[in-house]
C-alpha cells in the first residue's frame, strides 16, 4: 500500500484527493483535482525471466491468425497491450510508432495487442483497430485482437499501455513503463526507460532490473 501511495506522489498530477480501490488484482487510483477525475491502473509486473506465453490471435491489419512463433523477432520481441481509445496510449503514440520503426531493422519485433471488451467499447473492435493502424502508418508487426482476453491474463497485463520485452529466447527482461510522462504531468514523452532496456539487450548488457510499473487505463474486462 505504501509503495503505491509513494508512486502516486511522483507521477506529476495535481492531487487533492486519492482513493484506493483494491479490485483483487491491482490497486486502482482515482485522482480528483479541480473537477478532473481519472482512474489509473498500474501494471502487475510479470516476474523477470518468465517465458512469453504463446498465442495465436487475429491480426486486425492482415486478417490472418498469427502466432507468437511466427511474429517473434530474431533479437528481441516487444509486446505492448494497447487500445484505440485510451488517452494514455494516445499520449505516447509518437514514441510507440518511433520505437517500432527504429528497432525493427535491429531485429526487434513489436506486437501490439488489444484485449478490451468490444461489446462495452465498440471503438476498440477489429475494424477500428485496422483503421487506427493505417492512420499510424501500420508501424507494428501486427495489431492483434485478443477476443477471449486469455492472452492478457496469461501475460498478467492490467493496463494500457502495458509493455513486455523478451530476449531472443523469449525470456522477459523488461516489464514496466515507457518513461515518466503521463497525460497530465507535462513531461516530454521520450520513451527513455524502454529504449534503455532495448539498447542494453541488443548490446549484450544486462538490463537494469530496477523497473517502474506502467500506468494507464485498466483493460476493459468482459462481464462475468
Residue ranges and their predicted role:
Residues 8-9, 16:
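Cysteine-centered motifs
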Residues 11, 27-28, 64:
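N-terminal compositionally biased or targeting/leader segments
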Residues 13-14, 21, 91, 222:
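Mature cores of small secreted peptide/protein domains
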Residues 15-37:
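Short, Lys/Arg-enriched N-terminal segments with co-localized hydrophobic residues
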Residues 34-211, 218-224:
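Chalcogenol-based redox active-site neighborhoods
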Amino acid at each position: 500500500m505504501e509503495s503505491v501511495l509513494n508512486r502516486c506522489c511522483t507521477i506529476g498530477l495535481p492531487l487533492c484527493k486519492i482513493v484506493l480501490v483494491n479490485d483483487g488484482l491491482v490497486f486502482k487510483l482515482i485522482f480528483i483535482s479541480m473537477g478532473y477525475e481519472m482512474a489509473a491502473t498500474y501494471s502487475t509486473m510479470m516476474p523477470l525471466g518468465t517465458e512469453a506465453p504463446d498465442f495465436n490471435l487475429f491480426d486486425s491489419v492482415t486478417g490472418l491468425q498469427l502466432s507468437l512463433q511466427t511474429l517473434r523477432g530474431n533479437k528481441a520481441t516487444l509486446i505492448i497491450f494497447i487500445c484505440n481509445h485510451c488517452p494514455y496510449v494516445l499520449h505516447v503514440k509518437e514514441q510507440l510508432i518511433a520505437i517500432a520503426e527504429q528497432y525493427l531493422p535491429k531485429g526487434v519485433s513489436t506486437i501490439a495487442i488489444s484485449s478490451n471488451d468490444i461489446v462495452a467499447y465498440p471503438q476498440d473492435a477489429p475494424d477500428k483497430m485496422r483503421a487506427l493502424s493505417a492512420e499510424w502508418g501500420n508501424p507494428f508487426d501486427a495489431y492483434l485482437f485478443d477476443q477471449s482476453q486469455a492472452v492478457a491474463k496469461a501475460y498478467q497485463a492490467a493496463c494500457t499501455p502495458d509493455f513486455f520485452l523478451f530476449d531472443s529466447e523469449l525470456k522477459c527482461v523488461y516489464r514496466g513503463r515507457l518513461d515518466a510522462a503521463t497525460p497530465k504531468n507535462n513531461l516530454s514523452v521520450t520513451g527513455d526507460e524502454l529504449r534503455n532496456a532495448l539498447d542494453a539487450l541488443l548490446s549484450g548488457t544486462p538490463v537494469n532490473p530496477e523497473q517502474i510499473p506502467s500506468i494507464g487505463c485498466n483493460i476493459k474486462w468482459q462481464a462475468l
